């Protein structure tokens, strides 16, 4: 699967990313979701540092904590669009990235 790299995100891409982040941040408040404990007051997993968010990758749903800055990478934006197409964002499964875990690790190694 080839992912095209662009130097700048268009304003429509930025708007889409903001919408995705907004949807993800409005997940229901629950005590324990997918083995992750949430603080009922601020709706954030207690083990996720500020400026990061969890994603679940592959058929085994391996959990990764990724920095918000990755939202600016066109490759990561492509994965988010694939996630929206395959799963939508109105479910209790957390943000699930529909790709092979080996591919995801390879991709994120370029971001570091």
From Swiss-Prot:
Q: What induces it?
A: Induced by auxin (e.g. 2,4D). Up-regulated by brassinosteroids (e.g. brassinolide). Highly induced by a synergistic combination of auxin (e.g. IAA) and brassinolide. Accumulates in response to reduced red:far-red (R:FR) light, during shade; this light response can be attenuated by AGL8/FUL in the stem. Repressed by AGL8/FUL in stems and inflorescence branches. Accumulates in reduced red/far-red light ration (R:FR) conditions mimicking shaded conditions.
Keyword Transferase applies? no
Q: What is this protein called?
A: Protein SMALL AUXIN UP-REGULATED RNA 10
Q: What tissues express this gene product?
A: Confined to the veins and petioles of rosette leaves and cauline leaves, and specifically expressed at the abaxial side of inflorescence branche; relocates to both the adaxial (Ad) and abaxial (Ab) sides of the branch in reduced red:far-red (R:FR) light, during shade. Also present in flowers.
User: What InterPro entries does the entry give?
Assistant: SAUR_fam (IPR003676)
> Does Cell membrane show up as a keyword for this record?
yes
Cellular localization per UniProt: Cell membrane
This entry carries the following GO cellular component terms, namely: plasma membrane
Entry's transmembrane regions: none
User: Which of UniProt's keywords are assigned here?
Assistant: Cell membrane, Developmental protein, Growth regulation, Membrane
Q: Which lineage is the organism of this entry classified under, starting from the top rank?
A: Eukaryota, Viridiplantae, Streptophyta, Embryophyta, Tracheophyta
Coarse class of the primary localization is: membrane
Q: Please give the family membership noted in the entry.
A: Belongs to the ARG7 family.
User: What are the BP-aspect GO terms?
Assistant: developmental growth involved in morphogenesis; regulation of unidimensional cell growth; response to auxin; response to brassinosteroid; response to low fluence red light stimulus; response to red or far red light; shade avoidance
Which function does this protein serve? Answer: Provide a mechanistic link between auxin and plasma membrane H(+)-ATPases (PM H(+)-ATPases, e.g. AHA1 and AHA2), and triggers PM H(+)-ATPases activity by promoting phosphorylation of their C-terminal autoinhibitory domain as a result of PP2C-D subfamily of type 2C phosphatases inhibition, thus leading to the acidification of the apoplast and the facilitation of solutes and water uptake to drive cell expansion. Triggers plant growth probably by promoting cell elongation. Regulates branch angles and bending.
Mode of membrane association: Peripheral membrane protein
């Amino acid at each position: 699967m080839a992912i095209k790299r662009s130097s700048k995100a268009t304003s429509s891409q930025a708007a889409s990313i903001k919408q995705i982040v907004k949807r993800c941040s409005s997940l229901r408040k629950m005590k324990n979701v997918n083995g992750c404990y949430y603080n009922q007051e601020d709706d954030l997993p207690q083990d996720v540092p500020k400026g990061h968010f969890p994603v679940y990758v592959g058929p085994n749903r391996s959990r990764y904590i990724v920095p918000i800055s990755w939202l600016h990478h066109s490759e990561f934006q492509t994965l988010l669009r694939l996630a929206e197409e395959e799963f939508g964002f109105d479910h209790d499964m957390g943000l699930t990235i529909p790709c092979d875990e080996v591919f995801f690790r390879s991709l994120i190694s370029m971001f570091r």
